[in-house]
A protein has these predicted regions:
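Structural microenvironment flanking redox-active thiols in thiol-disulfide oxidoreductases
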Residues: 86-147
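Thiol/disulfide oxidoreductase modules built on the thioredoxin-like
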Residues: 143-199
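N-terminal targeting signals for export/organelle localization
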Residues: 1-49, 206
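Hydrophobic beta-strand anchors of alpha/beta hydrolase catalytic cores
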Residues: 72-73, 108, 174
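Short, acidic, Ser/Thr-enriched surface-loop or helix-capping motifs
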Residues: 55-56, 178
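Solvent-exposed coil/turn segments that connect beta secondary-structure elements
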Residues: 77-78, 111-116, 140-142, 152-153, ...
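Short active-site neighborhood of thiol/selenol oxidoreductases, capturing the structured segment around
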Residues: 61-91
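Short, hydrophobic alpha-helical segments
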Residues: 200-205
Length: 206
């Protein structure tokens, strides 16, 4: 392995490690928030994602559905009380800012880490409240693992006495994938529509 390749791998690994540390904790009284990094992180070398196969209201969703267009990707769940609605509202504003601009308008993909409760019907209804064009997908843990592991995403479900009433801790990073389906940038919180739109224009510029 030559020095340039080694350096690129180290930089890509550092980006994923930074993104993976942004973990959001819900419903855990007295448990401190982990320190989260701030500011966008553009990938020095764009990371190709492994093959994955998820599904959603529109049918199967795989790597081929990332090809040919830019994609903002976010992991969460529909019963998330704050972070997910905030992120999706932010993405609605980002899309509004990019409408009519020379750069192509990216697709927004919401990956649910709560497949037991987030049915296709619920995902469709939930996302339509923000933007009907948003794509909702999910899968069991085995199906989620390739994509989550590649991006450094962490999530953990917390059981309760009611098997269908529980919270989920999950990473709060918004990822940007290029038209080749590679990781181009990661945006840990705090996120603002102005920064995301500006970084997208910069990265998507010819």
């Amino acid at each position: 392995m030559n020095a340039k390749v080694a350096k690129a791998l180290v930089l890509a690994g550092a980006l994923l490690a930074l993104a993976g540390t942004a973990l959001v904790w819900h419903g855990l009284p007295g448990r401190p928030l982990p320190q989260e990094p701030s500011g966008p992180s553009a990938a020095a070398t764009r990371l190709s994602l492994p093959a994955f196969a998820l599904h959603g209201p529109r049918g199967a969703f795989a790597n081929t559905d990332l090809a040919g267009r830019w994609t903002f990707l976010f992991f969460g769940y529909t019963r998330c009380p704050d972070i997910c609605p905030t992120a999706l509202s932010l993405m609605t504003e980002v899309k509004g800012r990019l409408a009519g601009a020379p750069a192509p308008v990216p697709q927004v993909v919401f990956v649910s880490v709560d497949p037991l409760r987030d049915t296709n019907a619920l995902l469709a209804e939930y996302l339509a409240a923000f933007d009907a064009s948003f794509v909702g997908v999910s899968g069991d843990d085995a199906a989620l693992a390739p994509l989550a592991k590649a991006l450094g995403v962490r999530y953990e479900r917390h059981d309760s006495r009611d098997a269908r009433n529980y919270t989920v801790d999950h990473s709060a990073v918004i990822y940007l994938l290029d038209p080749q389906g590679r990781l181009a940038a990661a945006f840990p919180p705090p996120q603002t529509p102005g920064v995301l739109a500006a970084e997208f224009r910069r990265l998507a510029a010819p």
